Design a protein with these regions (language model features):
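Conserved pre-ATP/AMP-binding loop-to-beta segment of ANL
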Residues: 3-20, 53-54
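AMP-binding/adenylate-forming
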Residues: 34-40, 56-112
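Gly/Ser/Thr-rich phosphate-binding loop
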Residues: 116-168
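AMP-binding/adenylate-forming core of the ANL superfamily
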Residues: 179-207, 212-213, 267
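AMP-binding/adenylate-forming catalytic core of the ANL superfamily
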Residues: 203-290
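Conserved C-terminal "lid"/linker of ANL adenylate-forming enzymes
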Residues: 263-267, 280-315
Length: 315
């Protein structure tokens, strides 16, 4: 989809836009988003980041997905200037024009910016969504004093409903007027009076700090019940970030003794027995009873169209 394609759909007689979920937590699905909801979401973001008619916005994501669609709607709402470029990882490699006030990027693009500070300097503010921000990327952006934010949201909420300043905050703060609480599972419940959906119950395990602040821990879908101990893979992944220099995630496999046990899945074709044994020992030292019992190597991780890693459990 091009910007013109989206604008044609935006200005047609329908009161909704067709969108696709990312598929990171299940099969991608087609949903209809009310244009009024998209405008309300855009206004919340524009208010939070001071986006107005004099702002210059960069569209570097495909309008096929909600993040790209919402950048266009933000520009429409604010009457801001929008520049669209090809949505590839090597961001701003050949761009030498005026700097931008605001852009939404995925983690792979943010990594490119962190590796090329001269390009990052052309963006006053970036929001990073579509996948988790790795500890390594967070550290790089913090060292560069980037005005960068990790976002929390989903297609169903018309993009993000909360943001976290990378390198400074450990918790997310909602965009007004959204408020949050937790259900009996410890999962986030978001109340959004400005959107027609009203309330969304998620599968994200959180610590609620206030009605507008929460700390994200991980997905309940990924949680591992090992001998009565609840293990949240995303927390382990953050704790061991300094032990690996390749992509990895914590998966699980069945165990006749413990029910389930964690497994470290690593994207590599080159791991010697010596390296494997040393890594398992380091994991036991770092994580104790939560440590993975096995290391599985994959030549390449499966990804969704938006670049999220698809977790595959051992069976």
């Amino acid at each position: 989809m091009t910007v013109d394609d989206f604008l044609a759909e935006w200005h047609n007689a329908d009161d909704f836009i067709t969108a696709h979920t990312s598929g990171s937590t299940g099969t991608p699905k087609v949903i209809h988003l009310l244009k009024s909801d998209m405008l309300a979401s855009a206004r919340a973001t524009n208010a939070r980041f001071g986006i107005g008619a004099r702002s210059r916005l960069l569209l570097c994501l495909s309008p096929d997905y909600i993040a790209g669609k919402m950048m266009i709607v933000r520009a429409l709402d604010a009457r801001a200037r929008l520049t669209a470029i090809e949505p590839h990882r090597d961001l701003l490699a050949d761009y030498h024009g005026d700097p931008f006030d605001f852009a939404a990027v995925i983690p792979a693009q943010a990594q490119t910016l962190a590796d090329h500070p001269d390009r990052l300097a052309r963006l006053a503010t970036i929001i990073v969504g579509g996948g988790p921000v790795s500890p390594e990327l967070e550290s790089k952006l913090a060292d560069l004093n980037a005005n960068a934010y990790s976002t929390y949201g989903m297609t169903e909420t018309c993009s993000h409903i909360a943001v976290r300043r990378i390198g400074i905050d450990r918790h997310y703060t909602t965009l007004a007027p959204t408020t949050v609480s937790a259900d009996s599972r410890g999962c986030l419940v978001a109340r959004m009076p400005h959107l027609s959906v009203g309330e969304v119950t998620t599968n994200d395990i959180v610590d609620i700090l206030s009605a507008t602040e929460f700390r994200w821990r991980g997905r309940i879908d990924n949680a591992i019940n090992s001998g009565g101990v609840k293990i949240i893979p995303e927390e382990l992944e953050r704790e061991i970030a300094d032990l690996l220099d390749v992509r990895y995630y914590i998966g699980r496999r069945p165990s006749p003794t413990w029910g389930e046990v964690p497994v470290l899945v690593v994207e590599t074709t080159d791991m010697s027995d010596r390296r494997r044994d040393a890594l398992l020992a380091a994991l036991r030292t770092r994580l104790g009873i939560r440590a993975p019992r096995q290391i599985v190597t994959l030549a390449r991780f499966e990804e969704t169209p938006t670049g999220k890693v698809v977790r595959v459990d051992e069976r």
